[in-house]
Regions:
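Cysteine-nucleophile active-site neighborhood
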Residues: 105-174
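Short, Asp-centered acidic motifs that coordinate Mg2+ and/or phosphate
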Residues: 102
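Amide-donor transfer/coupling interface in amidating biosynthetic enzymes
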Residues: 1-71, 95, 99, 165-167, ...
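Well-ordered alpha-helical segments embedded in enzymatic catalytic cores
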Residues: 90, 123, 284-287
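Short beta-alpha junction loops
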Residues: 71-76, 144-145
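Short, solvent-exposed polar/charged micro-motifs at secondary-structure junctions
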Residues: 76-82, 222, 310
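Glycine-rich, highly charged phosphate/nucleotide-binding loops
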Residues: 80-99
Length: 310
């Protein structure tokens, strides 16, 4: 799938070197097709890494995708240059009158705080409420999934005794839903978090359908309102070295951290980490774009998006 990005976004050159089809703005204007409009609310500290990971994950269908990056106005990023944000990011006030085919809300390393203690919590809630009427399908990742469970259904998170950190085995529990079409019975996915939304509370919520879960990591994938809301408890978008970088970051800071589970061959951090989850990540995002973004966006919604976007 061609991903449309700003011409000089740093991730563009990296993706092209990986043989991923990235389309610049000039070429996209000369194609006779409507791209899917996907908004990404990027709450991760090093935003460039997440940009690359998500653009890579979105690049595996024949659909053209026009990505808009957004950051919260109420939080000052300490790990991403202001020049990068000013050039490549928008804010909610600038896009709130538009409609989008899809919205991705990323995770954030704030799970040790209560939701109300997060400085951009009110703004996040406003964006989630806005998405109810302005977005066809919203994909919530990791902390955003926990935040969504809390905001929509009142299900709070709980602290883990030890960080859930590594690559875990998951089982598909409902094959009738297109989001897991093409998944193996058992698949792997990374996790990196200190909290969890209790599996029993998710199971008890009648509005939620669980699609995949893990004995060690709990519920991984859930869906609501026929795909208008999708919740991913882990980080399938992570690249090969993300957990490695987090592990060494915490070691350098003197923080208590265990070797990532099921990640290094023989649990040896000197060895190259195994990449065991990429194909299912691609499958997940491809299914989301096809079945819940492209095929479910009503014609009237498309026209509204085109008119407002002019």
């Amino acid at each position: 799938m061609p991903i449309k990005t700003q011409n000089d976004l740093p991730a563009k050159e990296i993706l092209e070197n990986e043989n991923i089809f990235v389309m610049d703005e000039f070429r996209a204007l000369h194609q006779d097709m409507r791209p899917l409009q996907v908004l990404i609310l990027n709450n991760m500290p090093v935003k460039q890494d997440t940009e690359l990971q998500l653009l890579r994950a979105l690049s595996n269908t024949p659909l053209q995708v026009d990505v808009t990056f957004m950051n919260t106005k109420t939080h000052v990023s300490l790990n991403t240059p202001a020049s990068h944000l000013n050039k490549f990011y928008t804010t909610f006030d600038e896009i709130k009158d538009r409609t989008f085919d899809g919205l991705i809300v990323t995770g954030a390393p704030v799970e040790d705080n209560t939701y109300e203690e997060v400085d951009y919590w009110e703004e996040t809630c406003k964006i989630l409420d806005w998405a109810e009427t302005h977005v066809t399908s919203t994909l919530h990742i990791c902390w955003a999934a926990q935040a969504g469970f809390y905001h929509y259904y009142g299900i709070n998170k709980r602290q883990l005794t030890q960080k859930l950190f590594g690559v875990y085995e998951h089982k598909v529990s409902n094959r009738k839903i297109p989001l897991v079409r093409g998944f193996d019975d058992i698949f792997m996915a990374p996790h990196s978090r200190h909290t969890e939304t209790p599996s029993e509370a998710i199971h008890a919520c009648k509005d939620l359908t669980i699609l995949a879960e893990s004995e060690k990591a709990g519920v991984f994938l859930a869906i609501a309102e026929e795909g208008k809301k999708i919740f991913v408890a882990g980080h399938p978008e992570y690249d090969r070295y993300t957990l490695n970088n987090e592990y060494h970051r915490d070691l350098d800071k003197g923080l208590p951290i265990q070797i990532p589970y099921n990640y290094y061959p023989n649990d040896d951090p000197e060895q190259r980490p195994l990449l065991q989850w990429r194909s299912h990540c691609n499958n997940l995002y491809s299914n989301w774009l096809n079945y819940y973004v492209y095929q479910t966006t009503p014609y009237s919604f498309i026209n509204t998006a085109e008119i407002i976007g002019k």
